[in-house]
Amino acid sequence: MKKLLYTVMCCCALASCTNLDSERYDAINPDFFPTNEKDAEALVVGGVYAPFRSAEYSGVFSTAHSFQVIGDMSTDIAVCCWVNDSWIPLTTHNWTPNHSYTTLNYTDYAKYLGTMTLTLDRISNVEMSDEKKALLMAETHLGRGWLAFLLYDFYGPIPIPTLEDLKNPLDEVIEPRATQEEMTNFIETELTESLKGLPTRTTQFGRFDKGLAYTILMKYYMHEKNWAKAEECGRELLKAEYGYGLMDRYADIFTLENEGNKEIIFACTEERGTNLQLWHDHALPGNYPTKNASI
């Protein structure tokens, strides 16, 4: 009897599980996120606003190697006193396809175009007020258009992933480089589409609005030498409802007390101290006389 009991107990112990599907915690499951307005807001902040940050060595506005810094380093606008393989090729125009600072803005941020495309699809099915949905979708369109323009300005036409391909990430699909017409149509369409849901001027510091959209459109049209449309955008920004104007003192634009002043069209938000004196450390010579420990 004891042998039979032990046998039954062993058989029970050897019983296997029937559900072997593990739950992943390192990726967003669209089956249960986003499901409400709060989720959709979080998805836009994390998927659309994320690349437009300045976090030391991360973000398209990084003070170390952003689009602007790398672009300006290839001119006489910016200078870096660090003598290494990162900066010298930029100042001497001797970069190659393997030069990290030449390619990092593509390798780090092109993927966000796919993230924004998926974000646009996912928030479109979330129940929320029409006004809020229009705003979040407009912000996503602006993010896609702006990032695509930055990448286009640096690298020319780039691959633009389709929603179908993004929903099937395990398929081995190599997206072709967009044609010149496809690229420019994508940028212009995204930016103009964003105008439908954005406020004229946001009351939330650091968020996108029509003023920013028209500014990027103006720069894009200038890039394409479409001077008539560029002028239209510029004249739009002069209208009183945008509230833009010049500060009496140039230095006052950047003081903490004047945060969000009338001369700022868009400001990248970050925690205070994140980039404290970072570019001074790059640009000033090693024997610069200062008592500032951050330099």
What do these predicted ranges mean?
Residues 17-71:
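Acidic, glycine-rich segments characteristic of secretory precursors and extracytoplasmic regions
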Residues 141, 214-221, 233:
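TPR/Sel1-like alpha-solenoid repeat signature
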Residues 44, 53-58, 74-78, 83-107, ...:
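Elongated scaffold/linker segments in the mid-to-C-terminal portions of large proteins
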Residues 1-26:
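Bacterial Sec-dependent N-terminal signal peptides
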Residues 41, 49-53, 80-155, 178-182, ...:
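Conserved, well-structured interaction surfaces
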Residues 157-181:
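Short coil/linker segments at helix-helix boundaries
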